[in-house]
Amino acid sequence: MIWAHTDQYVGKILHVNPGHALSLQYHEVKDETIFLLTGEMRFWAGPSADELEEVALGAGEAFRVRPATVHRMEAITEIDILEASTPHLDDVVRIQDRYGR
């Protein structure tokens, strides 16, 4: 759900069910910060798909994803993520996706 969209920023809330994950991806320009509202998740980030570091995040924790950072989020429990980013909604380069996107 997009809750704000201006020429300067976008705010979204993402809901992910346990065991599901977002694409392994990066953004060329988009700069985003995620804040885990509820639940627990695994977050992988690094300079390339071969150099990812795994971090466990719980409710109330945040992480900034700068442009060119390869990343993926996977829900351990049901999660809700608050995302604030620059307004580049189509700036997604998918490296791997479980759902064929």
Enumerate the predicted regions with their spans.
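Glycine- and acidic-residue-biased ligand/ion/polar-headgroup-sensing regions
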Residues: 28-47
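Short acidic-glycine-tyrosine-enriched beta hairpin
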Residues: 47-68
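Double-stranded beta-helix
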Residues: 74-101
